[in-house]
C-alpha cells in the first residue's frame, strides 16, 4: 500500500482503537495529508509546510512516480491551494471546545480527565502505530462544526479517491444510491445478490412450467418476466403493444392455475417471488389439495383421503414385492399327518366344552334379549343384516393370524389360532414350559363385500403340539398358497400355507399346512370329528449352533416376524432374555442346516444380537424396506434397527411398556399399544411414533383407560384396530403420517367403536337375566377370581356398532359411550377379566380387506366387517385382480398324471 492511501485513511476513515479514535491533531492531519497529496510543482507556502514535516523512515521514502498525482488531479486551481494555506495558520493550534456546548444530548458530568502531553509526531505509515498501547493518541476527535479547511480537505479526498471507489468484482448498478435515500448497506446488498443467485439455481433445477397449448410463443428470455401485477391499468391502456400484453395475460393465467410452481427465472428482479406456503426442502411450490365435503359413508373427505391413497399404494407394493410361489421343497406329505383317535386327542383339547352365556345388542335393531351358549368348536350363523359371526374355541385366545391368499383368488378365508387348554392357567415367562396344546385352523368361507357370508365358521382341523403355550404365530406373507384343486402326485398335497409357531419351550416350529379338502379326503369315512392330527414339522428352528445348543439360555420365544418381501427367506424371533435371532430358511450351509433321520430339518441362526435388556414382546418388519426392523421389550424401550448395522439402534425411545406394534406400509413409523402400568395419567392408549427420519413428535391416536393387549393395522385401509382389557374394540383411521400430525384437528372424528363387551350379573335362573344393568351400561359385578365363579353369576353382553354407515357419528350412542369410557371408566383389576380382548387381526387379503377377527379371555372369537370403509375403488380393484388371476392360472384338469410337474401348471409368463 502506498503512502497516499495511508494518509487518506488516517484522515477520512479513522478506525477506533479501544474506546478512542486514532487521529492526530487537526494541524498534524492537514500536514500529513498535504505531505502525501502534493505534487512536484508546489508553491512557497506548501514548501514551508513540507519542510516542517518529519523525515520518513528508511525504506518508506516516496519515489517521484509515487508522489505524482493523477493527471485529472493536477488541474487543481491555485486559488483553492492558497485558501488552504491561509487556513492552515488558523488551525495550527487545537481549539478548545466550549464548556456549555452540547453534542447530541446531555453533557457528561463527572471529574475531568487529566490531559496527557502530546507525543512526538510520526509519519502515518503501515506498521508504525503502537498496537500495544491503544490509548497513546493525545487528542480525541474534535467536536463541533468543521472548519473550512476540513471541508476542503474532505472534498479533496473524495476527488482523489473517486477513481478507486469502484470495485471490478461488483456491478455498478448494485451500489447506486437512490435519490433522496440513504445508501444501501453492504450486508443488505450481499443478501440480495445471494437470494437472486438462489432463485436462479432453483429455477434451473425445477421443470419448466406447463404452458397453454393454444397460446402464442413465449416472449424473448432476455426480457425480464413480471411475476404478478397487483392491479391492471385503469381503462386497459396498452403500453408496449398488443403482443406483449397477450403474453403477459397468458403468463398470469398459467400462474393462477399452477399456484406458482417455482421461483422466477429472471435474476434482474430486486426480490425473488417465493411462495410462503412452500415447505423447507421441497422442490415444488404446489400446495396440499384441500379435501372438502363429505364422503358417501358419512365421514369427511379429508379423513377418507388417506384410505383411498393406501389402497393404491398397497396394490402396487404387492405387485412388486410379493410372489406367487416360494419354498417349493416344503410341500405337505400325507404320510406325515397322523389322525388321532378320540382317546389320543383328549389331552390336547381345551377343557371347556361350552361357552359362557352371551348376548348381542346391535345398534339400530330391536333388542331380543336372547342368550347364547355354544359348544366347543361350534359357531352361530352370521347375522343377515350386520354379517357378524361368533364361534367358541374352548379356551383363552393368545395367538391369531389370517392365512394369506393371492389377490383375486376368490377362495375361502382361513384363520389359525391357539387357545390355552385351561381357563385359569397361568404361564410364567422366566422359565421354559412344555405341555400339550392344540393349534386350530378355522374356515370362514368366502368373505365378500356385497353379500352376507352364506356358510358358518367351522373348525377345519387341529394340530396337536407338545411344545407348551404358543405365544405367537405367523404365516408366510406370500408364495405359500396354491389352488385347492392343484393335482399332486401322492403323497403330496396342495399347500395352503407355511406357518411358524413361537413356543414356550424356546423352539420355533415351521409347518406346511395342506388344503382341508385334500387332507380330509385321505381319512376314512368313520373318522372321529373334529379331526386332530399329530404332524411332523418341516423344520425346527433353534438358537445356538451345532457345537453349543442350550435353549434355556435365551428362554421362551415370545414373538415372530416374517420378512415381508419376496423371497421371504428370513424369519426373526424375539426371546425372553432380549435376544433377537434371524434364520435363513433356504440356506444350504452345513453349519446352519442339519437333516434329521425323520426327514425334517433343524436350522440354526445366521445372525443374532441383544436388542433389549429384558423380554422382546413384539417385532415388526418394515414392509417398504426389509433392512429395517422395530422391536419393543419389557425394558419399556422401542428400538428401530438397521440390520446391516445391528450393533446400535437407529433410534431408541423409552416411554412406556409396549404390548404390540403395527407398522403400516405407507408410513415411516409404528403404532404402539401400551400397558397402563407405566403410562402417565391421561396418556395411556395408542400412539404413533415416528422412526426418527422425519423427526415428528408422537401422535396420540386414541386414549384408553386399560391395557391395550393387541393392535393390528390394515395396509389397505390405513386403519388400526385395538382391543383392551375392558372389552372394547375400537378402530382409528390414521391421518397422512407423511405430513406432520401436529396439525391434525379433532382426532376424535377419526376413531369409532366396533363393539363393547361388558360382564353383566344375572339371577340364578338363566331365563331371567337382569337387563337393567346391561341397558344402563354401568355393570357392577361381584369380584370373582375364577372362571367357574364368573360364569355362574355373569354373562357377557356385546354391544355392536352399526358399521355400515358413519353418518352423524359423534351423536350416536356407541360413540358417546366410548367417549365416556375414555374419561370416566372404572377398572376392577382384582377379578377375572372375562371380557378382555387379547388378539385383534385385520385381514391382509384384498378379497376380504374390510374383515376383522378378535377374541380374548372368554374363548369367544368374533368376526366383523367394517362395511363403511369399503369403497367403490376397492371393489374395482377386486374385479381387476380376479380377472388377472383367472388369466394367469389356467383351470387344471381333474385327472392326475404320473410325473406331472407340481408347479409348471401354475405360473405363466409375466406380461
Curated annotation (Swiss-Prot):
Gene coding for it: GTF3C2
Basic and acidic residues bias: start-end ranges: 64-81
Compositionally biased residues, Polar residues: 35-46
Positions of post-translational Phosphoserine modification: 63, 132, 165, 167, 220, 260, 597, 871, 892-893, 901
Species of origin: Pongo abelii (Sumatran orangutan)
Amino acid composition bias (Acidic residues), ranges on this chain: 253-262
Statement: the UniProt record of this protein carries the keyword tRNA processing: no
PTM annotation (Phosphothreonine): residues: 895
Localisation: Nucleus
A matching Pfam family: WD40
Claim: NAD is one of the keywords in the record: no
UniProt name for this protein: General transcription factor 3C polypeptide 2
WD repeats: 465-521, 552-593, 611-651, 832-874
Keyword entries, A-Z: Nucleus, Phosphoprotein, Repeat, Transcription, WD repeat
Biased composition (Low complexity): 263-275
GO biological process, one term: transcription by RNA polymerase III
